[in-house]
Amino acid sequence: MSISRRSILSSAALAAFPIAGAAKDPKTGMPLRPLGKTGVMVSALAFGAGSRWLAYKDPQKAMEALDLALKSGINYVDSAASYGDGQSETWIGEYLKSHKKNFFLVTKITPRGADEAKRQIERSLKNFGLSQVDLMHIHSLGGEDDLAKVEAADGILKVIQQMKEQKVARFIGVTCHTNPKVLATFLGRHDLDSTQMALNIAQIGNAAPSDKAGQGLTGASGFEAVAMPVALKKKMGLTAMKVFAQEKLLGKAAPNVLVRYAMSLPVSAAVVGMPKLEYVEDNIKTAKSFTPLSKEEMQKLPASVSAQMRASIDRFFADHVDC
């Protein structure tokens, strides 16, 4: 069934959208959702292995957090070559030296040129101690100029397509922080398995970095309205990131409500960074007891974020890649 943009423009409509094929892990009680049409079931809560994981500083504490997450039913681990200049991947590689790989491993590749991208992929595999990752994303698609670099004959898109053909990556995709229109264009043009976008109560993706006033911004030009419908229509895996907007949304709603907002969208998983063990425990409890927010709540929460705050968050992410 195709999904029109109009039918899911509002958060209320999104909240009512059923997650087809959703289930629960019988051993852990963790909710599982299909990653698009890949045939893979992933935990609705994913472990973000970016700056919030690296905040543990002590590798042993970081391993403890990862181990707790995995034993509690989280099976999607989200890393990137740029996180700590490879430190995130290296920590995961250290974990895998003494643990069986029983989770879905994701990394992201940044360079736009083919040669540099291939070198980074080689380094990532070495960091993990693996010959294959489950999902390889093009990291942080930007504006039109960046799109042209990605799609160039000697660009990164060709490289990750080759990685899938060579079984270095089981699946491929792209992430985007601030450019819903560009992301929608890219998703529409290419046959990808997955995409990750910034989804939170601020409904960001509306303001250009130069938009200092932040006037007239609405969710109608954000990721939910512009890019999400394309991913859903193509039955791609869809993951939410920046659920807390780097903690900028804390205070607008309780942490568990922010997680529930993301999980109430038609996503495969909400990727959350958890810099303390108690945060891991709290978010696991939220996921296992998850009930969707009501249509009214899904409308009220974005309305609580001012246009100025939304613009500020947009500008922040326009210049920021979690590292």
Language model segments and positions:
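C-terminal segment of N-terminal export signals and the immediately downstream linker at the start
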Residues: 19-45
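Conserved, mostly hydrophobic/aromatic
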Residues: 35, 47, 77, 92, ...
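Active-site mouth loops of central-metabolism enzymes
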Residues: 50-59, 108-114, 250-251
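Glycine-rich, proline-tolerant flexible connector loops at the mouths of alpha/beta enzymes
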Residues: 78-95
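Alpha-helix-loop-beta-strand connector modules within alpha/beta enzyme cores
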Residues: 93-106, 157-162
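Glycine/proline-rich, positively charged
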Residues: 112-239
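Structured C-terminal cap/extension of enzyme domains
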Residues: 214-216, 222-323
